[in-house]
Amino acid sequence: MNGDLNSWDKFCNYLWFDNKLNIWLDISKISFTRKEIDNLEEKFIDVFSSINELENGAISNIDENRQVGHYWLRNPSISPSSKIEEEICADINEISEFGKQILNGDIKNKNNQKYTDVLWIGIGGSGLGPILITDSLQKSSRGLNFSYIDNVDPFLISERLEELSEKLSTTLFVVVSKSGGTPEPRIAMEIIKSHCENNSLEWNSNAIAITMKDSKLFKKATSENWLKIFNLQDWVGGRTSITSSVGLLPLALINENIFEFIRGASLMDEATRTVDFKNNPAALLSSAWYLTGDGIGKRDMVVLPYRDRLQVFSKYLQQLVMESLGKKFNRKGEVVNQGISVFGNKGSTDQHAYVQQLRDGIDNFFCIFIELLDSPSTSIFDKKENPKEYLSGFLQGTRSALSSENRQSITITLEKLNCFSLGALIALFERAVSFYAELVNINAYDQPGVEAGKKAAANIIEYQQKVRNLLDEGGEYSINDITSLFDNSVSEPIFFILREMCFGNDNYLVKGDWSNPNSLVIQKINS
Protein backbone atom coordinates (compact mmCIF):
# COMPACT_ATOMS: atom_id res chain seq x y z
CA MET A 1 0.00 0.00 0.00
CA ASN A 2 1.40 3.40 -0.93
CA GLY A 3 0.27 7.00 -0.80
CA ASP A 4 -1.50 6.82 -4.19
CA LEU A 5 -4.69 8.90 -3.91
CA ASN A 6 -6.42 6.95 -6.68
CA SER A 7 -5.77 3.38 -5.57
CA TRP A 8 -8.89 1.18 -5.71
CA ASP A 9 -7.39 -1.25 -3.20
CA LYS A 10 -6.70 1.59 -0.79
CA PHE A 11 -10.26 2.86 -1.21
CA CYS A 12 -11.69 -0.59 -0.43
CA ASN A 13 -9.38 -1.18 2.53
CA TYR A 14 -10.11 2.13 4.27
CA LEU A 15 -13.78 2.71 3.43
CA TRP A 16 -15.83 2.64 6.64
CA PHE A 17 -19.60 2.07 6.71
CA ASP A 18 -22.10 1.40 9.49
CA ASN A 19 -25.52 0.02 8.58
CA LYS A 20 -27.10 1.33 11.79
CA LEU A 21 -25.98 4.86 11.04
CA ASN A 22 -25.98 4.65 7.22
CA ILE A 23 -22.85 6.79 7.11
CA TRP A 24 -19.74 6.20 5.00
CA LEU A 25 -16.25 7.57 5.68
CA ASP A 26 -13.56 7.49 2.99
CA ILE A 27 -10.00 8.54 3.91
CA SER A 28 -8.33 6.88 0.91
CA LYS A 29 -7.52 10.21 -0.73
CA ILE A 30 -5.24 11.16 2.15
CA SER A 31 -1.59 10.45 1.36
CA PHE A 32 -0.28 7.73 3.68
CA THR A 33 1.46 4.37 3.45
CA ARG A 34 0.49 1.16 5.21
CA LYS A 35 3.54 1.53 7.46
CA GLU A 36 2.49 5.03 8.52
CA ILE A 37 -1.05 3.97 9.36
CA ASP A 38 0.18 0.85 11.18
CA ASN A 39 2.56 2.95 13.30
CA LEU A 40 -0.29 5.30 14.16
CA GLU A 41 -2.54 2.39 15.06
CA GLU A 42 -0.13 1.48 17.86
CA LYS A 43 -0.51 4.96 19.36
CA PHE A 44 -4.25 4.48 19.56
CA ILE A 45 -3.88 1.92 22.34
CA ASP A 46 -3.18 4.85 24.68
CA VAL A 47 -5.71 7.11 22.94
CA PHE A 48 -8.56 4.66 23.48
CA SER A 49 -7.53 4.22 27.10
CA SER A 50 -7.53 7.99 27.72
CA ILE A 51 -10.97 8.47 26.15
CA ASN A 52 -12.30 5.61 28.25
CA GLU A 53 -10.99 7.30 31.40
CA LEU A 54 -12.59 10.58 30.30
CA GLU A 55 -15.97 8.91 29.85
CA ASN A 56 -15.62 7.25 33.25
CA GLY A 57 -15.38 10.66 34.91
CA ALA A 58 -11.65 11.38 35.16
CA ILE A 59 -10.61 15.03 35.51
CA SER A 60 -9.70 15.33 31.84
CA ASN A 61 -9.64 19.12 31.71
CA ILE A 62 -6.64 19.36 34.01
CA ASP A 63 -6.10 23.11 33.57
CA GLU A 64 -9.61 23.91 34.84
CA ASN A 65 -9.88 20.86 37.15
CA ARG A 66 -13.09 19.70 35.46
CA GLN A 67 -14.64 16.53 34.20
CA VAL A 68 -15.63 16.43 30.53
CA GLY A 69 -19.11 14.99 30.27
CA HIS A 70 -20.76 15.86 26.98
CA TYR A 71 -20.66 12.17 25.99
CA TRP A 72 -22.83 11.35 29.02
CA LEU A 73 -25.58 13.58 27.64
CA ARG A 74 -26.49 11.08 24.92
CA ASN A 75 -26.01 7.98 27.07
CA PRO A 76 -26.70 8.91 30.69
CA SER A 77 -26.12 5.32 31.83
CA ILE A 78 -22.34 5.73 31.32
CA SER A 79 -22.14 8.80 33.56
CA PRO A 80 -20.07 8.29 36.72
CA SER A 81 -22.94 8.55 39.21
CA SER A 82 -26.65 7.78 39.43
CA LYS A 83 -27.25 11.39 40.45
CA ILE A 84 -25.79 12.71 37.18
CA GLU A 85 -27.70 10.07 35.20
CA GLU A 86 -31.01 11.04 36.80
CA GLU A 87 -30.31 14.74 36.27
CA ILE A 88 -29.56 14.28 32.56
CA CYS A 89 -32.69 12.18 31.98
CA ALA A 90 -34.84 14.69 33.88
CA ASP A 91 -33.44 17.60 31.85
CA ILE A 92 -34.13 15.85 28.53
CA ASN A 93 -37.71 14.99 29.48
CA GLU A 94 -38.33 18.48 30.84
CA ILE A 95 -37.20 20.09 27.57
CA SER A 96 -39.27 17.68 25.49
CA GLU A 97 -42.40 18.35 27.56
CA PHE A 98 -41.84 22.11 27.56
CA GLY A 99 -41.51 22.15 23.77
CA LYS A 100 -44.81 20.30 23.40
CA GLN A 101 -46.56 22.69 25.80
CA ILE A 102 -45.31 25.74 23.91
CA LEU A 103 -46.23 24.37 20.47
CA ASN A 104 -49.62 23.06 21.63
CA GLY A 105 -50.48 26.36 23.30
CA ASP A 106 -50.66 24.88 26.79
CA ILE A 107 -48.17 27.57 27.80
CA LYS A 108 -49.15 31.02 26.51
CA ASN A 109 -48.10 34.60 27.13
CA LYS A 110 -49.74 36.98 29.62
CA ASN A 111 -52.34 37.92 27.00
CA ASN A 112 -53.29 34.27 26.49
CA GLN A 113 -51.64 34.19 23.05
CA LYS A 114 -49.54 31.36 21.64
CA TYR A 115 -45.86 32.05 21.21
CA THR A 116 -44.77 32.56 17.61
CA ASP A 117 -41.05 33.38 17.75
CA VAL A 118 -37.80 32.84 19.60
CA LEU A 119 -35.08 35.46 20.01
CA TRP A 120 -32.01 33.46 20.98
CA ILE A 121 -29.20 35.32 22.76
CA GLY A 122 -25.94 33.37 22.97
CA ILE A 123 -22.30 33.66 21.92
CA GLY A 124 -19.85 31.03 20.61
CA GLY A 125 -21.17 27.49 20.90
CA SER A 126 -24.28 28.84 22.62
CA GLY A 127 -25.13 30.54 19.32
CA LEU A 128 -23.48 28.39 16.66
CA GLY A 129 -25.01 25.13 17.89
CA PRO A 130 -28.63 26.37 17.83
CA ILE A 131 -28.05 28.10 14.47
CA LEU A 132 -26.77 24.82 13.04
CA ILE A 133 -29.84 23.03 14.43
CA THR A 134 -32.41 25.40 12.96
CA ASP A 135 -30.61 25.96 9.64
CA SER A 136 -30.14 22.23 9.09
CA LEU A 137 -33.43 20.84 10.32
CA GLN A 138 -36.25 23.37 10.56
CA LYS A 139 -38.95 22.78 7.99
CA SER A 140 -41.00 25.62 6.54
CA SER A 141 -43.91 26.75 8.75
CA ARG A 142 -43.06 24.20 11.43
CA GLY A 143 -42.46 25.22 15.01
CA LEU A 144 -41.50 28.70 16.18
CA ASN A 145 -39.57 31.20 14.06
CA PHE A 146 -35.99 31.67 15.26
CA SER A 147 -33.90 34.85 15.29
CA TYR A 148 -30.44 35.13 16.81
CA ILE A 149 -28.30 37.68 18.57
CA ASP A 150 -24.86 36.08 18.63
CA ASN A 151 -22.87 39.31 18.73
CA VAL A 152 -23.13 42.76 20.31
CA ASP A 153 -23.20 44.50 16.93
CA PRO A 154 -25.61 47.41 17.54
CA PHE A 155 -27.01 47.11 14.02
CA LEU A 156 -27.75 43.42 14.55
CA ILE A 157 -29.61 44.11 17.80
CA SER A 158 -31.51 46.99 16.22
CA GLU A 159 -32.47 44.88 13.20
CA ARG A 160 -33.72 42.03 15.37
CA LEU A 161 -35.92 44.39 17.38
CA GLU A 162 -37.26 45.93 14.19
CA GLU A 163 -37.98 42.53 12.63
CA LEU A 164 -39.85 41.39 15.73
CA SER A 165 -41.47 44.73 16.56
CA GLU A 166 -45.03 43.47 15.97
CA LYS A 167 -44.37 40.09 17.58
CA LEU A 168 -42.34 40.85 20.69
CA SER A 169 -45.28 40.03 22.96
CA THR A 170 -45.37 36.50 21.51
CA THR A 171 -41.59 36.05 21.42
CA LEU A 172 -39.64 33.82 23.78
CA PHE A 173 -36.35 35.42 24.83
CA VAL A 174 -33.77 32.68 25.43
CA VAL A 175 -30.57 33.79 27.15
CA VAL A 176 -27.69 31.30 27.22
CA SER A 177 -24.72 31.85 29.50
CA LYS A 178 -23.13 29.08 31.52
CA SER A 179 -21.66 31.37 34.17
CA GLY A 180 -24.01 34.28 33.64
CA GLY A 181 -21.01 36.58 33.47
CA THR A 182 -20.17 36.52 29.76
CA PRO A 183 -20.44 40.18 28.63
CA GLU A 184 -21.95 39.71 25.15
CA PRO A 185 -25.17 37.87 26.08
CA ARG A 186 -25.54 39.98 29.23
CA ILE A 187 -25.33 43.25 27.28
CA ALA A 188 -27.76 42.05 24.59
CA MET A 189 -30.14 40.75 27.26
CA GLU A 190 -30.18 44.07 29.11
CA ILE A 191 -30.85 46.00 25.89
CA ILE A 192 -33.75 43.75 24.86
CA LYS A 193 -35.15 43.69 28.41
CA SER A 194 -35.00 47.48 28.65
CA HIS A 195 -36.66 47.85 25.25
CA CYS A 196 -39.53 45.60 26.33
CA GLU A 197 -40.03 47.42 29.61
CA ASN A 198 -39.91 50.85 27.94
CA ASN A 199 -42.62 49.74 25.51
CA SER A 200 -44.90 48.13 28.12
CA LEU A 201 -44.02 44.64 26.88
CA GLU A 202 -43.45 41.56 28.98
CA TRP A 203 -39.93 40.34 29.54
CA ASN A 204 -39.94 38.20 32.67
CA SER A 205 -42.85 35.98 31.67
CA ASN A 206 -41.38 35.50 28.17
CA ALA A 207 -37.76 34.95 29.22
CA ILE A 208 -35.92 31.63 29.46
CA ALA A 209 -32.44 31.08 30.89
CA ILE A 210 -30.04 28.27 30.05
CA THR A 211 -27.32 28.37 32.67
CA MET A 212 -25.60 26.60 35.56
CA LYS A 213 -27.41 26.30 38.84
CA ASP A 214 -26.60 29.22 41.17
CA SER A 215 -24.90 31.25 38.40
CA LYS A 216 -25.48 35.00 38.14
CA LEU A 217 -28.02 34.38 35.38
CA PHE A 218 -29.73 31.64 37.39
CA LYS A 219 -30.14 33.99 40.37
CA LYS A 220 -31.41 36.80 38.16
CA ALA A 221 -33.94 34.59 36.38
CA THR A 222 -35.11 33.15 39.70
CA SER A 223 -35.52 36.51 41.44
CA GLU A 224 -37.35 38.00 38.44
CA ASN A 225 -39.58 34.95 38.02
CA TRP A 226 -38.66 34.18 34.41
CA LEU A 227 -40.78 31.70 32.49
CA LYS A 228 -38.24 28.86 32.67
CA ILE A 229 -34.69 27.97 33.65
CA PHE A 230 -32.95 25.03 31.98
CA ASN A 231 -29.81 23.47 33.38
CA LEU A 232 -26.37 23.72 31.74
CA GLN A 233 -23.92 21.50 33.55
CA ASP A 234 -20.48 22.59 34.73
CA TRP A 235 -18.88 19.67 32.88
CA VAL A 236 -20.26 20.72 29.47
CA GLY A 237 -18.17 23.16 27.42
CA GLY A 238 -19.76 25.65 25.05
CA ARG A 239 -18.35 24.11 21.89
CA THR A 240 -19.62 20.66 22.91
CA SER A 241 -22.98 21.79 24.30
CA ILE A 242 -25.17 20.96 21.31
CA THR A 243 -26.51 17.75 22.88
CA SER A 244 -27.27 19.63 26.11
CA SER A 245 -30.21 21.97 26.68
CA VAL A 246 -28.44 24.43 24.35
CA GLY A 247 -29.20 22.22 21.33
CA LEU A 248 -32.21 20.29 22.60
CA LEU A 249 -34.41 23.32 23.31
CA PRO A 250 -34.21 24.62 19.71
CA LEU A 251 -35.02 21.12 18.47
CA ALA A 252 -38.07 20.96 20.71
CA LEU A 253 -39.27 24.42 19.65
CA ILE A 254 -39.03 23.64 15.91
CA ASN A 255 -40.99 20.44 16.54
CA GLU A 256 -38.13 18.06 15.81
CA ASN A 257 -37.42 14.82 17.65
CA ILE A 258 -34.81 15.46 20.33
CA PHE A 259 -34.63 11.76 21.18
CA GLU A 260 -33.62 10.88 17.60
CA PHE A 261 -30.92 13.56 17.71
CA ILE A 262 -29.56 12.07 20.93
CA ARG A 263 -29.85 8.53 19.54
CA GLY A 264 -27.80 9.44 16.45
CA ALA A 265 -25.05 10.96 18.59
CA SER A 266 -25.15 8.01 20.99
CA LEU A 267 -24.84 5.42 18.22
CA MET A 268 -21.87 7.27 16.73
CA ASP A 269 -20.26 7.43 20.17
CA GLU A 270 -20.79 3.68 20.44
CA ALA A 271 -19.23 3.09 17.01
CA THR A 272 -16.16 5.08 18.07
CA ARG A 273 -15.64 3.13 21.30
CA THR A 274 -14.37 0.06 19.50
CA VAL A 275 -10.64 -0.53 19.91
CA ASP A 276 -10.59 -2.07 16.44
CA PHE A 277 -8.76 0.82 14.78
CA LYS A 278 -9.92 0.26 11.19
CA ASN A 279 -13.54 -0.08 12.29
CA ASN A 280 -13.49 3.09 14.38
CA PRO A 281 -14.56 6.11 12.28
CA ALA A 282 -13.25 8.75 14.69
CA ALA A 283 -9.90 6.97 14.84
CA LEU A 284 -9.73 6.91 11.04
CA LEU A 285 -10.82 10.55 10.73
CA SER A 286 -8.41 11.88 13.35
CA SER A 287 -5.62 9.74 11.86
CA ALA A 288 -6.23 11.32 8.47
CA TRP A 289 -5.92 14.79 10.01
CA TYR A 290 -2.74 13.74 11.79
CA LEU A 291 -1.08 12.13 8.77
CA THR A 292 -1.90 14.87 6.28
CA GLY A 293 -0.62 17.56 8.65
CA ASP A 294 2.43 15.64 9.91
CA GLY A 295 0.96 15.74 13.41
CA ILE A 296 1.52 19.50 13.69
CA GLY A 297 -1.42 20.90 11.74
CA LYS A 298 0.50 21.77 8.57
CA ARG A 299 -2.66 21.71 6.47
CA ASP A 300 -5.91 23.68 6.72
CA MET A 301 -9.23 21.83 6.81
CA VAL A 302 -11.60 22.93 4.02
CA VAL A 303 -15.15 21.77 4.74
CA LEU A 304 -17.41 21.42 1.69
CA PRO A 305 -20.94 20.15 2.45
CA TYR A 306 -22.87 19.56 -0.75
CA ARG A 307 -26.19 20.58 0.75
CA ASP A 308 -27.34 24.12 1.52
CA ARG A 309 -28.81 23.13 4.87
CA LEU A 310 -25.31 22.26 6.11
CA GLN A 311 -23.74 25.55 5.09
CA VAL A 312 -23.34 26.58 8.76
CA PHE A 313 -21.52 23.33 9.54
CA SER A 314 -18.12 24.71 8.51
CA LYS A 315 -18.56 27.63 10.95
CA TYR A 316 -19.62 25.19 13.64
CA LEU A 317 -16.49 23.09 13.01
CA GLN A 318 -14.32 26.20 13.08
CA GLN A 319 -15.07 26.62 16.75
CA LEU A 320 -15.12 22.92 17.63
CA VAL A 321 -11.78 22.17 15.95
CA MET A 322 -9.86 25.42 16.33
CA GLU A 323 -10.82 26.22 19.93
CA SER A 324 -10.14 22.63 20.96
CA LEU A 325 -6.89 22.01 19.08
CA GLY A 326 -5.36 25.47 18.82
CA LYS A 327 -3.02 25.27 21.81
CA LYS A 328 0.38 26.79 22.55
CA PHE A 329 1.44 24.18 25.11
CA ASN A 330 1.11 20.41 25.33
CA ARG A 331 0.33 18.65 28.60
CA LYS A 332 4.03 18.57 29.47
CA GLY A 333 4.19 22.36 29.28
CA GLU A 334 6.24 22.30 26.08
CA VAL A 335 5.56 24.92 23.39
CA VAL A 336 3.97 23.10 20.44
CA ASN A 337 1.66 25.68 18.80
CA GLN A 338 -0.81 23.02 17.71
CA GLY A 339 -3.95 23.59 15.66
CA ILE A 340 -5.85 23.00 12.44
CA SER A 341 -7.37 25.99 10.64
CA VAL A 342 -10.90 25.41 9.33
CA PHE A 343 -12.83 27.21 6.63
CA GLY A 344 -15.45 26.41 4.03
CA ASN A 345 -18.86 27.25 2.68
CA LYS A 346 -20.79 24.81 0.48
CA GLY A 347 -20.61 22.92 -2.77
CA SER A 348 -21.08 23.51 -5.59
CA THR A 349 -20.79 27.24 -4.90
CA ASP A 350 -17.17 26.91 -3.84
CA GLN A 351 -16.29 25.22 -7.13
CA HIS A 352 -16.83 28.65 -8.67
CA ALA A 353 -14.80 30.38 -5.97
CA TYR A 354 -11.65 29.14 -4.24
CA VAL A 355 -11.50 25.57 -5.58
CA GLN A 356 -9.38 27.05 -8.38
CA GLN A 357 -6.66 27.74 -5.82
CA LEU A 358 -7.18 24.40 -4.09
CA ARG A 359 -6.37 22.56 -7.31
CA ASP A 360 -3.69 24.76 -8.82
CA GLY A 361 -2.35 26.94 -6.00
CA ILE A 362 -0.45 26.33 -2.79
CA ASP A 363 -0.86 22.80 -1.46
CA ASN A 364 -1.50 23.58 2.22
CA PHE A 365 -4.92 22.03 2.87
CA PHE A 366 -7.11 18.96 2.78
CA CYS A 367 -10.81 18.92 1.90
CA ILE A 368 -13.66 17.26 3.73
CA PHE A 369 -16.52 16.64 1.32
CA ILE A 370 -19.90 15.95 2.91
CA GLU A 371 -22.37 14.21 0.62
CA LEU A 372 -26.10 13.53 1.06
CA LEU A 373 -27.84 10.78 -0.89
CA ASP A 374 -31.46 11.80 -0.31
CA SER A 375 -33.65 14.02 -2.45
CA PRO A 376 -37.06 15.69 -1.92
CA SER A 377 -40.04 13.48 -2.71
CA THR A 378 -41.42 15.77 -5.38
CA SER A 379 -42.31 15.55 -9.06
CA ILE A 380 -41.02 19.01 -9.96
CA PHE A 381 -37.62 17.74 -11.14
CA ASP A 382 -37.09 16.47 -14.66
CA LYS A 383 -35.85 12.88 -14.55
CA LYS A 384 -33.28 13.73 -17.22
CA GLU A 385 -31.91 16.72 -15.30
CA ASN A 386 -32.32 15.94 -11.63
CA PRO A 387 -30.37 18.50 -9.55
CA LYS A 388 -29.40 15.80 -7.04
CA GLU A 389 -27.52 13.92 -9.76
CA TYR A 390 -25.85 17.11 -10.94
CA LEU A 391 -24.80 17.97 -7.39
CA SER A 392 -23.34 14.50 -6.94
CA GLY A 393 -21.53 14.85 -10.25
CA PHE A 394 -20.08 18.21 -9.20
CA LEU A 395 -18.81 16.71 -5.94
CA GLN A 396 -17.22 13.69 -7.62
CA GLY A 397 -15.76 15.89 -10.34
CA THR A 398 -14.18 18.29 -7.85
CA ARG A 399 -12.85 15.39 -5.78
CA SER A 400 -11.34 13.82 -8.90
CA ALA A 401 -9.87 17.11 -10.14
CA LEU A 402 -8.16 17.66 -6.80
CA SER A 403 -6.76 14.13 -6.53
CA SER A 404 -5.41 14.35 -10.10
CA GLU A 405 -3.10 17.06 -8.75
CA ASN A 406 -2.36 15.05 -5.58
CA ARG A 407 -4.54 17.33 -3.46
CA GLN A 408 -5.85 15.38 -0.48
CA SER A 409 -9.44 14.92 0.66
CA ILE A 410 -11.82 13.00 2.90
CA THR A 411 -15.41 12.18 1.97
CA ILE A 412 -18.26 11.64 4.43
CA THR A 413 -21.55 10.41 2.98
CA LEU A 414 -24.90 10.43 4.79
CA GLU A 415 -27.98 8.62 3.52
CA LYS A 416 -30.16 11.59 4.50
CA LEU A 417 -30.12 14.71 6.65
CA ASN A 418 -32.38 14.52 9.69
CA CYS A 419 -32.15 14.73 13.49
CA PHE A 420 -30.58 11.31 13.73
CA SER A 421 -27.88 11.80 11.10
CA LEU A 422 -27.01 15.34 12.22
CA GLY A 423 -26.51 14.07 15.77
CA ALA A 424 -24.26 11.32 14.44
CA LEU A 425 -22.26 13.70 12.23
CA ILE A 426 -21.63 16.11 15.09
CA ALA A 427 -20.60 13.26 17.39
CA LEU A 428 -18.16 11.94 14.79
CA PHE A 429 -16.28 15.24 14.71
CA GLU A 430 -16.44 15.66 18.48
CA ARG A 431 -14.87 12.24 18.94
CA ALA A 432 -12.26 12.86 16.23
CA VAL A 433 -11.25 16.10 17.96
CA SER A 434 -10.87 14.24 21.27
CA PHE A 435 -8.78 11.52 19.60
CA TYR A 436 -6.54 13.99 17.77
CA ALA A 437 -5.89 15.91 21.00
CA GLU A 438 -4.77 12.68 22.66
CA LEU A 439 -2.49 11.87 19.72
CA VAL A 440 -0.66 15.19 20.08
CA ASN A 441 -0.97 15.30 23.90
CA ILE A 442 -2.87 18.56 24.33
CA ASN A 443 -5.88 19.56 26.44
CA ALA A 444 -8.81 19.85 24.02
CA TYR A 445 -11.17 21.20 26.67
CA ASP A 446 -9.64 24.45 27.90
CA GLN A 447 -9.35 27.76 26.04
CA PRO A 448 -6.62 29.94 27.59
CA GLY A 449 -6.42 32.07 24.45
CA VAL A 450 -10.13 32.88 24.69
CA GLU A 451 -9.77 33.74 28.37
CA ALA A 452 -6.80 36.00 27.57
CA GLY A 453 -8.93 37.78 24.98
CA LYS A 454 -11.73 38.26 27.50
CA LYS A 455 -9.33 39.77 30.04
CA ALA A 456 -7.84 42.10 27.44
CA ALA A 457 -11.33 43.20 26.35
CA ALA A 458 -12.29 43.83 29.99
CA ASN A 459 -9.24 46.10 30.33
CA ILE A 460 -10.26 48.07 27.24
CA ILE A 461 -13.83 48.45 28.52
CA GLU A 462 -12.39 49.79 31.79
CA TYR A 463 -10.32 52.34 29.86
CA GLN A 464 -13.39 53.34 27.84
CA GLN A 465 -15.16 54.33 31.03
CA LYS A 466 -12.10 56.15 32.38
CA VAL A 467 -11.74 58.19 29.17
CA ARG A 468 -15.45 58.99 29.14
CA ASN A 469 -15.34 60.14 32.78
CA LEU A 470 -12.26 62.27 32.12
CA LEU A 471 -13.85 64.07 29.18
CA ASP A 472 -17.06 64.54 31.16
CA GLU A 473 -15.07 66.64 33.65
CA GLY A 474 -14.36 69.21 30.90
CA GLY A 475 -11.21 70.50 29.26
CA GLU A 476 -9.19 69.59 26.17
CA TYR A 477 -7.06 66.48 26.04
CA SER A 478 -4.55 65.05 23.59
CA ILE A 479 -3.85 61.34 23.43
CA ASN A 480 -0.57 61.94 25.25
CA ASP A 481 -2.42 63.86 27.97
CA ILE A 482 -4.78 60.94 28.51
CA THR A 483 -2.16 58.19 28.45
CA SER A 484 0.05 60.10 30.90
CA LEU A 485 -2.83 59.95 33.38
CA PHE A 486 -3.38 56.22 32.90
CA ASP A 487 -0.62 54.17 31.34
CA ASN A 488 1.85 55.32 28.69
CA SER A 489 1.72 51.87 27.04
CA VAL A 490 -1.92 52.23 25.96
CA SER A 491 -1.68 55.06 23.42
CA GLU A 492 -3.00 52.92 20.57
CA PRO A 493 -6.04 51.62 22.50
CA ILE A 494 -6.80 55.19 23.63
CA PHE A 495 -6.77 56.30 19.98
CA PHE A 496 -9.24 53.54 19.07
CA ILE A 497 -11.46 54.44 22.04
CA LEU A 498 -11.55 58.12 21.07
CA ARG A 499 -12.27 57.34 17.43
CA GLU A 500 -15.17 55.09 18.40
CA MET A 501 -16.55 57.73 20.80
CA CYS A 502 -16.24 60.74 18.53
CA PHE A 503 -17.33 59.60 15.06
CA GLY A 504 -21.04 60.21 14.57
CA ASN A 505 -21.31 61.85 17.99
CA ASP A 506 -21.87 65.61 18.17
CA ASN A 507 -21.07 65.71 21.88
CA TYR A 508 -17.34 65.87 21.17
CA LEU A 509 -15.24 68.51 19.43
CA VAL A 510 -12.15 67.16 17.71
CA LYS A 511 -9.24 69.33 16.60
CA GLY A 512 -6.40 67.98 14.50
CA ASP A 513 -6.00 65.35 11.81
CA TRP A 514 -7.17 61.75 12.33
CA SER A 515 -4.31 60.59 10.08
CA ASN A 516 -1.88 62.10 12.60
CA PRO A 517 -2.93 60.82 16.04
CA ASN A 518 -0.43 63.04 17.88
CA SER A 519 -2.19 66.14 16.52
CA LEU A 520 -5.59 65.27 17.99
CA VAL A 521 -7.19 67.26 20.80
CA ILE A 522 -10.64 66.22 22.06
CA GLN A 523 -13.13 68.11 24.17
CA LYS A 524 -16.66 67.31 25.27
CA ILE A 525 -19.01 70.16 24.34
CA ASN A 526 -22.51 68.78 25.04
CA SER A 527 -23.85 66.81 27.97
From Swiss-Prot:
It catalyses: alpha-D-glucose 6-phosphate = beta-D-fructose 6-phosphate. The keyword Cytoplasm applies. It is found in: Cytoplasm. Pathway: Carbohydrate biosynthesis; gluconeogenesis; Carbohydrate degradation; glycolysis; D-glyceraldehyde 3-phosphate and glycerone phosphate from D-glucose: step 2/4. GO terms for biological process: gluconeogenesis; glucose 6-phosphate metabolic process; glycolytic process. Its main location: cytoplasm. Belongs to the GPI family. NCBIfam families: PRK14096.1. This is Glucose-6-phosphate isomerase.
